[in-house]
Regions:
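Acidic/His- and Gly-rich active-site-bordering loop/insert found
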Residues: 3-104, 113-116, 120-130
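Histidine-centered active-site/metal-ligand motif
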Residues: 24-28, 104, 108-111, 168-169, ...
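Divalent metal-coordination and catalytic microenvironments
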Residues: 25, 64, 78, 108, ...
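Histidine/acidic-residue-rich, glycine-tolerant segments that coordinate divalent metal ions
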Residues: 85, 91-103, 110, 116, ...
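Metal-dependent amide/peptide-bond hydrolase catalytic core
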Residues: 215-398
Length: 398
């Protein structure tokens, strides 16, 4: 029996255990950097599997090691995030969230359960591969500045140094049984923009006595789009979107100030820095030119995510070996962001997608919605494929 077949066999053997882990995690979600019970559960399972670990990274993070033969030969890390979102779950399932207003609506329960499953499989096969596999259970992916940034600062990729890191993420647009890969640039950076436009409020019938912040804010929003369309290189994907505009006046009341919130996303760090400076300068100068003022606050989020080309090609080939060519898809650029991006700026990285969609079972909702759920057939694939990719990355040069 080949190693791939042995991994598939173990994934099938442990499938119900992996599902049970996922359902426990789903029923007991915790918000970013508050994953205390989740961390305790992961530690309990690692102890049960006989895998040594160190806890306490960024509060709740865990790093474990599985040493094969010749453990110093090569080190590959696998990452799973553990936090949930502040969403009220609307799924009617036995494992529905017990924590009101908190839900695993982004699939991090799947990621953690898959990594635990991969860990169990790899530990049982550690005499069959050379090198070391590092397991990174990470908190706080959903909250800036991102748990990955803290894990890196606290040495999660060191001692021994990881030459590569792999991560997977659920994708409800991809049918269960299939996975997706993309080599090179994949996901965008993400920065939050907060504008407070100040003027002088008053009666709507006497605009000459006021400095209208609603009008100023409207001009600012339109003008800022010119930064993307006329300053940005059209070959660099960029998005500037504003989703919150608060002007607490009335039909005949001009307010004193307007608050605007939005996001800027791109895939080039130099352009990112330049664009943010231009956004600040244009908002401030336009407000001043119209008689008001604009306070600009920019919260820097995650950098862009780039999949190492050769590593990603290797992983795609390995996925074809494991699942068949018909079940491995090529992904397009994705303007969402992920704090796995921090790892991609530290070492060779491959971030791929795990299909979870099954229309017959009603598993069709997108992530970050109250009805998001998966076809749990994906868990056996998620755990087994991650184990296989780790082994192939150890085995092959790229």
């Amino acid at each position: 029996m080949s190693l791939a077949e042995r991994i598939k066999s173990l994934a099938g053997e442990h499938e119900q255990h992996i599902i049970a882990n996922r359902q426990h995690l789903h029923a007991n979600p915790e918000l970013s950097f508050e994953e205390y019970q989740t961390s305790a559960y992961v530690q309990e399972k690692l102890t049960e599997y006989g895998i040594p670990f160190k806890a306490g990274y960024s509060g709740t993070g865990i790093v474990a090691h599985i040493e094969g033969k010749n453990p110093q030969k090569k080190v590959v890390a696998l990452r799973g995030d553990m936090d949930a979102l502040p969403i009220h779950e609307k799924n009617d399932v036995p494992y529905k969230s017990k924590n009101e207003g908190v839900m695993h609506a982004c699939g991090h329960d799947v990621h953690t359960a898959s990594l635990l499953g991969a860990a169990r499989i790899l530990n049982e096969l550690k005499d069959s591969f050379e090198g070391t596999i590092k397991l990174v259970f990470q908190p706080g992916e959903e909250k800036a500045p991102g748990g990955a940034s803290y894990m890196i600062k606290e040495g999660a990729l060191k001692n021994p140094d990881a030459g590569a890191i792999l991560g997977q993420h659920v994708m409800p647009l991809i049918p269960v049984g299939k996975v997706g890969f993309r080599s090179g640039m994949y996901m965008a950076s993400a920065d939050e923009i907060y504008l407070t436009v100040k003027g002088k409020g008053g009666h709507g019938a006497m605009p000459e006595l006021n400095i209208d912040p609603v009008l100023i804010a409207s001009h600012i929003i339109v003008a800022l789009q010119q930064i993307i369309s006329r300053n940005g290189d059209p070959k660099i994907p960029s998005v500037l979107s504003f989703g919150r505009f608060i002007a607490e006046g009335a039909t005949n009341v001009i307010p004193n100030e307007v608050k605007i919130e939005g996001t800027f996303r791109t895939m080039n760090e130099e352009w990112r820095a330049s664009a943010l400076k231009k956004i600040r300068k244009m908002a401030e100068s336009m407000a001043e030119g119209m008689g008001g003022s604009c306070e600009v606050e920019i919260i820097h989020g995650y950098p862009y995510l780039e999949n190492h080309p050769e590593l990603s090609d290797l992983c795609r080939e390995a996925a074809v070996e494991y699942l068949g060519e018909e079940n491995v898809l090529d992904l397009d650029l994705w303007m969402a962001s992920e704090d796995f991006s921090y790892y991609s700026h530290e070492t060779d990285a491959c971030f791929y997608r795990l299909g979870t969609r099954n229309e017959a079972k009603g598993a069709t909702s997108m992530v970050h919605t109250p009805t998001f759920n998966i076809d749990e057939e994906a868990l056996k694939i998620g755990a087994g494929l991650m184990a296989w990719l780790a082994v192939r990355t150890l085995e092959k040069d790229y």
